[in-house]
Amino acid sequence: MNKWSAEKAHEWYKNQEWLIGANFLPSSAINQLEMFQPETFDEHTIKTELKMASALGFNSIRVYLHDLLWDIKKEFLVNFEKFLVICDKENIKPMIVLFDDCHRSNPKLGKQFLPLKGIHNSGWSQSPGHEIVKEIHEGKLDQLPRLKKFIQEVLSLYSEDERILLWDIYNEPGQFGIGENSIELLQHVWGWALEVRPSQPLTSCMHGSIGEKIIELNKENSDIITFHAYESKNLESIIKELLEIRRPIICTEYMAREFGTTFEFSLPIFKKNNIGCYNWGFVAGKSQTHFGWETILNLKESVRKKDFIFEDEGIPEPKVWFHDIYRKDGSPYDQKEINFIKNFLK
C-alpha cells in the first residue's frame, strides 16, 4: 500500500490536539535497551516522570525502541505494554521510533555502559548500528530478515492500537558519518512499513537526516512531514520551506538553549504555524543531554580515564543546560521556563 493522501493526513492531524511533548528517556536509563530490558525496566521512574510531563501540559512523547529488543521479544512486550498503560493513564500518546543512526555503534543486549561524567548521550546506541548499515550498503544482506521481522512484527502488533500516535521509522538516517550509505536500509524500511501500512501515520525526518537522496526518500514516503531544528536562526526558514509540501508538519526534535531554540522562542512559532513539537529531553539523568554536543569529543578520553558515574553518584550539571527540563528530584532547571510553558498551554 502507498502513503496517505494529503487529505487523509490533514484529516488525521485535525483530529489531534496541538501536539506538544518531549523526547523521553527515563532518567534511570542510559539508552533504549536499558529502558526496556527486564533487568533495568524502571516502571516507578517512568510513572513518576510521565506524571510530571502530563502536569506540565504535554500530551505526547517521542520514545525509541531498538531492533535487539526483538531478541527478547516476550520480555520486551511485557514492559512495552506497561509503558503504554502508563502513557494512556496520563493521556500521553507516544510517537515510536524504530531505527536510529546516532551515537554508539556495536549495540549489545545485557548490561549497558556506565555514564561518562559530563558527556552528552555517552551510552546511546545506534539501531541497528553502522556496521550493519554498511554491510547492507555493500550488498551483504544476511541481517535483513531479522530487521524486517522486527519492523513488520512491531508495526503489525500495534497497527490498530489507538494508544500509539505515530511511527517514526528511522531517526536521522545518515548521521554520525554514515552519510548516504544508509539509503539502502532506509529504502528497505520504507518498503517493509508500507507493506504493513498501520493505521497510524508513518514518517522519517527531512531536516536532521543527511544526504539529498535520503531526505528526498523521506519526503516522498512520509504521511506527516517531520523535521529537527536546534538553531533559532534557521527555524522559520525551515518551516517556510516545509509548508510548501502541504502536509501536516511536526518538529520532532528542538530546544538547545545554547543555540536559541528555547521554549520562549520556539513555542509561539510552532503554535502560529500549527506545528506539533517535541523538545529533546525531559528529566536530566544517565543520558546527560543537559550537557552540550561538544562534550562528545571527549568521549574516548573519558573512557580511557574510566571517568564513569557509578550508581551511588549524582549526575553533574553544567552552568547552562543544553537540553532537558527537570532534575531527578523534580525540581526544574529554570522555574521561569516552567511558568512560561504552563501559561502558554492554558
Q: Which residues fall in each region the model found?
A:
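Short beta-strand and adjacent tight-turn residues that come in two discontinuous sequence segments
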Residues: 63, 97, 227, 279-280
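Short acidic, S/G/P-rich loop/turn micro-motifs used as interaction or catalytic elements
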Residues: 231-232, 257
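Active-site mouth of glycoside hydrolases
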Residues: 1-222, 236, 245, 258, ...
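Substrate-binding cleft of secreted/luminal carbohydrate-active enzymes
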Residues: 20-21, 248-252, 256-346
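Hydrophobic/aromatic ligand-binding patch that stacks against planar heteroaromatic rings
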Residues: 86, 241, 269
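Active-site neighborhood of phospho(di)ester-bond hydrolases with catalytic His/Asp-centered motifs
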Residues: 205, 227, 250-253
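Active-site metal-binding loops of divalent metal-dependent hydrolases
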Residues: 172-173, 229, 253-254
